[in-house]
């Protein structure tokens, strides 16, 4: 604000209040890849673990590590999808999502668990407490379907419909965050595959739909931590999406003295926001 006093222009301003002592964070790990069962149906990949909270203490002058986890790979031969990779902010670690089940094994455990396969071993993987949910189990009767991967918002769902005519299970719901000033859904579970053409399991938000005969499981969208879609019959399974790390603190406080990893920087709703889609550091 400025004013004219006795012919002289005076000005007042609000200086920055110094380096932050605490920040709000969102840490999402990479999602798990969908499972592949040759001639059957794979489970959907579990979402990457998701952690978010305010009031996390930070210390000026010390570099804080930021790690953004990659998504787990889908498969083209009988195997579980690969687990996603952990994401890290300082001491906060979100666990990579579990791979969907493939030939002869249960869905893998992770931030959220991978879905069970159709045929053979039908158990789903478990999620990590406070980060995500379990996958849905598969079925082993007739034209079986794979279960959906777990998400940060709910468990994955088993295949839908009669056991001899099953649609792949839907992936678990994601988590809605507004840390970047918009409503964004992260960490949805991958859809389960189906042996029957066209009966794909629908994915959770920004995750990969399941495959079916002649249709490959879809890859999850990068930097949302979703699981990949399970395979159907002989089609490939989808890969999980990479994770993301976001922090914010009041815009009235000082900017960082250094960052690496090229974070996107936003200013909105009275906050400065830093978004990493690749690994780096931040120093206040």
Regions found by a protein language model. Give the residues of each.
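Low-complexity, glycine/proline-biased repetitive segments and flexible coils/loops
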Residues: 2-13, 20-284
């Amino acid at each position: 604000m400025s004013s004219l006093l006795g012919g002289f222009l005076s000005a007042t301003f609000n200086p920055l209040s110094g380096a932050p002592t605490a920040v709000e964070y969102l840490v999402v790990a990479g999602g798990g890849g969908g499972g592949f069962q040759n001639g059957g149906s794979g489970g959907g990949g579990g979402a990457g673990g998701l952690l978010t909270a305010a009031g996390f203490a930070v210390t000026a002058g010390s570099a804080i590590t930021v790690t953004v986890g990659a998504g787990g790979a889908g498969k083209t031969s009988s195997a579980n999808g690969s687990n996603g990779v952990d994401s890290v902010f300082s001491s906060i670690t979100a666990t990579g999502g579990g791979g969907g089940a493939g030939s002869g094994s249960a869905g893998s455990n992770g931030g959220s668990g991978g879905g069970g396969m159709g045929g053979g071993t039908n158990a789903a993987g478990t999620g990590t407490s406070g980060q995500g949910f379990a996958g849905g189990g598969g079925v082993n009767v007739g034209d079986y379907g794979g279960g959906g991967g777990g998400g940060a918002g709910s468990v994955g769902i088993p295949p839908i419909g009669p056991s001899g005519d099953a649609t792949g299970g839907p992936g678990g719901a994601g988590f809605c965050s507004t840390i970047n000033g918009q409503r964004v859904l992260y960490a949805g579970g991958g859809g389960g595959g189906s042996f029957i053409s066209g009966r794909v399991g629908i994915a959770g938000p920004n995750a990969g739909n399941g495959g079916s005969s002649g249709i490959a499981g879809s890859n999850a969208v990068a930097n949302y931590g979703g699981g990949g879609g399970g395979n159907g019959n002989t089609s490939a399974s989808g890969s999980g999406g990479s994770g993301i790390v976001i922090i914010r603190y009041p815009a009235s406080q000082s900017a960082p003295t250094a960052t690496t990893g090229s974070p996107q920087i936003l200013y909105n709703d009275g906050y400065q926001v830093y978004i990493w889609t690749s690994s780096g550091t931040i120093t206040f």
